[in-house]
């Protein structure tokens, strides 16, 4: 591919796109490089994006649930650790762990003592056998010297084993003392935790009793206020109805008086008409006009009387309803008064007498009953408070004796 004519040569370079080399007539090379570029990212369709999101939803849900569970577990563990630290369970658990470790060390020391004792006993047995043989051998025999030397070595070994045994016993005693101290510390921590729990339970019970007393006092006060409101309404009701009845009765009496005067005038006109007989037409027309005016006035008075009568009927119905309500109120008040004055409860089914409504005795009875209810509510509150205080004071010595014995 060499020569004077232009030739195109394709050369392959590692990691580089193909290079086109052109050789000219003068021998110079002109390099032309063709670069290859990747196509741009294609835009995703909305359907594809939605489908991908749908496929990723389960994984997102699992990740979210795992995160929520992890956070909930960490939060619960943190609060539980705080509770254990507040109550003292951490100290008790740590003391129990120390007891377990001390027990393990003590058991190891006991094993060493057992091994040392067994070795010492075996050595003493061997020494006894050697001494028995030495006693049976004559002093002139050559074996006597060997047995004496063996006895000497065994005595030295026995001394070493005895020292090791004594050291093991001392170590066992030390480990046992540490184990006993750990057990005492654990018992002390457990007793402290129990006392702390009892104290907090006592404080909680006292606070609960105080909250109960305060709640009962508040409820009694609210009920007393409601009873006061009902009594005030009951007191206002008869007074307003009595005023309305008085006004309607006065207007009715005035209407009756006007009607009687009108009737008297009519009678006088009739008698005058009969006495005069037949008269002039002018006089007859004047009397006719007077009669028409009087008839219109009479009709108006009759219509007004009917309205007044209907109003009085309505007021009478309201008064009957109020009497029933007052009788029910009186029954309720008598039932409320029954615990304070037993044996004085009478029938309350009947309606109240009209003299109470006329002379205002119902209002006085209601006010008196209001005072009695207020005094009874105050007595109940004071008695409940005294009972709670006495119970607390009576419980204190028992709790002190219980804590002292424990």
UniProtKB/Swiss-Prot annotation:
The chain crosses the membrane at residues 199-219, 383-403. Residues 220-382 are mitochondrial intermembrane. Residues 36-198, 404-406 are mitochondrial matrix. PANTHER family: COILED-COIL DOMAIN-CONTAINING PROTEIN 51, MITOCHONDRIAL POTASSIUM CHANNEL. Residues 113-140 form a coiled coil. One of its GO terms (cellular component) is potassium channel complex. Residues 1-35 form a transit peptide. It is found in: Mitochondrion inner membrane. The mitochondrial potassium channel (mitoK(ATP)) is composed of 4 subunits of CCDC51/MITOK and 4 subunits of ABCB8/MITOSUR. Inhibited by ATP via mitoK(ATP) channel. The keyword 4Fe-4S does not apply. GO terms for biological process: cell volume homeostasis; mitochondrial potassium ion transmembrane transport; potassium ion transmembrane transport. Keywords: Coiled coil, Ion channel, Ion transport, Membrane, Mitochondrion, Mitochondrion inner membrane, Potassium, Potassium channel, Potassium transport, Transit peptide, Transmembrane, Transmembrane helix, Transport. It is a multi-pass membrane protein. It catalyses: K(+)(in) = K(+)(out). Disruption phenotype: Knockout mice exhibit no visible phenotype. Mutant mice are slightly more sensitive to the ischaemia-reperfusion protocol. This is Mitochondrial potassium channel. The gene is Ccdc51. GO terms for molecular function: mitochondrial ATP-gated potassium channel activity. Pore-forming subunit of the mitochondrial ATP-gated potassium channel (mitoK(ATP)). Together with ATP-binding subunit ABCB8/MITOSUR of the mitoK(ATP) channel, mediates ATP-dependent K(+) currents across the mitochondrial inner membrane. An increase in ATP intracellular levels closes the channel, inhibiting K(+) transport, whereas a decrease in ATP levels enhances K(+) uptake in the mitochondrial matrix. May contribute to the homeostatic control of cellular metabolism under stress conditions by regulating the mitochondrial matrix volume. It comes from Mus musculus (Mouse). The keyword Transmembrane applies.
């Amino acid at each position: 591919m060499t020569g004077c004519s232009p030739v195109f040569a394709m050369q392959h370079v590692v990691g580089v796109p193909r290079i086109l080399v052109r050789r000219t007539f003068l021998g110079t090379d002109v390099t032309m490089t063709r670069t290859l570029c990747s196509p741009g990212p294609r835009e995703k369709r909305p359907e594809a994006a939605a489908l991908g999101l749908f496929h990723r939803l389960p994984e997102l849900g699992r990740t979210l649930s795992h995160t929520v569970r992890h956070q909930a577990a960490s939060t619960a563990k943190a609060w539980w650790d705080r509770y254990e630290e507040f109550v003292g369970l951490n100290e008790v658990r740590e003391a129990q762990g120390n007891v377990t470790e001390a027990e393990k060390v003590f058991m190891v020391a006991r094993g060493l003592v057992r091994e040392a004792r067994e070795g010492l006993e075996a050595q003493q047995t061997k020494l006894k056998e050697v001494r028995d043989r030495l006693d049976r051998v004559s002093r002139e025999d050559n074996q006597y010297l060997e047995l004496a030397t063996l006895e000497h070595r065994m005595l030295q070994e026995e001394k070493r084993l005895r020292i090791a045994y004594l050291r093991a016993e001392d170590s066992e005693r030390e480990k046992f003392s540490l184990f006993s101290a750990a057990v005492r510390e654990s018992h002390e921590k457990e007793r402290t935790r129990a006392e702390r729990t009892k104290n907090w339970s006592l404080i909680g019970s006292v606070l609960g009793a105080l909250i109960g007393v305060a709640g009962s006092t508040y409820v009694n006060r609210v009920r007393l206020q409601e009873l006061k409101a009902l009594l005030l309404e009951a007191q206002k009701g008869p007074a307003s109805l009595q005023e309305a009845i008085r006004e309607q009765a006065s207007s009715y009496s005035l209407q009756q008086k006007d009607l009687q005067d009108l009737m008297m005038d009519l009678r006088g006109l009739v008698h005058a008409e009969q006495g005069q007989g037949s008269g002039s037409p002018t006089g007859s027309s004047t009397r006719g006009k007077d009669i028409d005016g009087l008839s219109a006035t009479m009709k108006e008075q009759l219509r007004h009387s009917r309205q007044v009568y209907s109003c009085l009927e309505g007021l009478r119905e309201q008064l009957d309803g109020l009497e029933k309500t007052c009788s029910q109120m009186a029954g309720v008040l008598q039932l409320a008064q029954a615990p304070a004055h037993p044996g004085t409860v009478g029938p309350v089914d009947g309606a109240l007498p009209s003299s109470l409504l006329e002379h205002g005795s119902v209002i006085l009875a209601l006010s008196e009953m209001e005072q009695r209810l207020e005094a009874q509510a105050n007595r109940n509150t004071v008695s409940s408070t005294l009972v709670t205080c006495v119970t607390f004071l009576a419980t204190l010595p028992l709790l002190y004796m219980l804590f002292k014995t424990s």
